[in-house]
């Protein structure tokens, strides 16, 4: 999911597409979910990562730090992409060194899936998902099949619901038990089934 963006003057660490834990360095849960990836911030943008706007708020961002404010991110993406967030508090940790420190870069590596678009509903917001096409609408709701959730997983999306929180990233990265039943979060499917389908789609 992604376009060509002006390269920053730094080494680009390309992170191959694949399962989330192939490119997530570590995960923390401060006030939200903070992901540390194996690439600097500008490399993340250049290589096809969605940079959460909220991560760039209140962090003392400036040009010489290599970080962008909300308008900067919007300008870089040229309004070609839709970025959805579950809340403004997600990814709100201090990220002063995100652009220069590979261990603190934050963003979502998204697969090259030009045929997929997410049609967000107010009660089913999808966090930090960058889309490059409107050819197909995938509407997440209670009756959705594992196939639909597989699309979100394939995009590295963090799924939040009104009545509960199902953090796909956390289960993929931290938990060995991928058969966790999502029904208690209002999702009529299991993560394992969705993962199987996501794998088959590749």
From Swiss-Prot:
GO terms for molecular function: toxin activity. Its main location: secreted. Disulfide bonds: none annotated. Belongs to the cationic peptide 01 (latrotoxin) family. 03 (alpha-latrotoxin) subfamily. Coiled coil: none annotated. Processed by furin-like proteases at both the N- and C-termini. Contains 1 disulfide bond. The H8 helix is predicted to insert into membranes and form pores by assembling into tetramers. The helix is contained within a helical bundle domain that undergoes significant conformational changes during pore formation to allow exposure of the H8 transmembrane helix and transition of the toxin from a soluble monomer to a transmembrane tetramer. The lineage of its organism: Eukaryota, Metazoa, Ecdysozoa, Arthropoda, Chelicerata. Residues 175-181 are annotated as: 4C4.1 epitope. Expressed in venom gland, cephalothorax, and abdomen tissues from both males and females. One of its GO terms (biological process) is exocytosis. The keyword Disulfide bond applies. It comes from Latrodectus mactans. InterPro entries: Ankyrin_rpt-contain_sf. ANK repeats lie at residues 95-109, 110-120, 122-132, 133-138, 142-161, 163-170, 171-182, 184, 185-191, 193-202. Is the main neurotoxin responsible for the human envenomation syndrome known as latrodectism that results from bites by Latrodectus species. Iso and Leu residues are assigned by comparison with orthologs. GO terms for cellular component: extracellular region; host cell presynaptic membrane; membrane; other organism cell membrane. This is Alpha-latrotoxin-Lm1a. Keywords: ANK repeat, Disulfide bond, Exocytosis, Membrane, Neurotoxin, Presynaptic neurotoxin, Repeat, Secreted, Target cell membrane, Target membrane, Toxin, Transmembrane. Homotetramer in membranes. Presynaptic neurotoxin that causes massive release of neurotransmitters from vertebrate (but not invertebrate) nerve terminals and endocrine cells via a complex mechanism involving activation of receptor(s) and toxin insertion into the plasma membrane with subsequent pore formation. Binds to neurexin-1-alpha (NRXN1) in a calcium dependent manner, adhesion G protein-coupled receptor L1 (ADGRL1, also termed latrophilin-1 and calcium-independent receptor of latrotoxin (CIRL)), and receptor-type tyrosine-protein phosphatase S (PTPRS), also termed PTP sigma. It is found in: Secreted; Target cell membrane.
């Amino acid at each position: 999911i992604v376009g060509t963006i002006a390269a920053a003057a730094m080494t680009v660490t390309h992170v191959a597409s694949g399962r989330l834990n192939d490119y997530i360095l570590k995960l923390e849960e401060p006030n939200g979910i903070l992901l540390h990836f194996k690439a600097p911030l500008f490399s993340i943008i250049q290589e096809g990562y969605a940079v959460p706007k909220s991560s760039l708020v209140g962090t003392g961002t400036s040009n010489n730090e290599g970080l962008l404010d909300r308008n900067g991110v919007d300008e870089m993406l040229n309004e070609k992409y839709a970025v959805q967030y579950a809340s403004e508090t997600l990814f709100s940790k201090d990220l002063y060194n995100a652009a220069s420190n590979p261990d603190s870069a934050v963003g979502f590596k998204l697969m090259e899936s030009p045929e997929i678009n997410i049609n967000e509903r107010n009660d089913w917001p999808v966090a930090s998902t960058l889309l490059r096409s409107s050819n197909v609408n995938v509407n997440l709701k209670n009756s959705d099949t594992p196939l639909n959730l597989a699309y979100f997983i394939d995009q590295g999306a963090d799924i939040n619901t009104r009545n509960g929180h199902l953090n796909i990233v956390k289960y993929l990265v931290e938990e060995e038990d991928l058969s966790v039943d999502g029904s208690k979060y209002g999702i009529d499917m299991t993560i394992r089934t969705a993962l199987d389908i996501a794998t088959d789609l590749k």
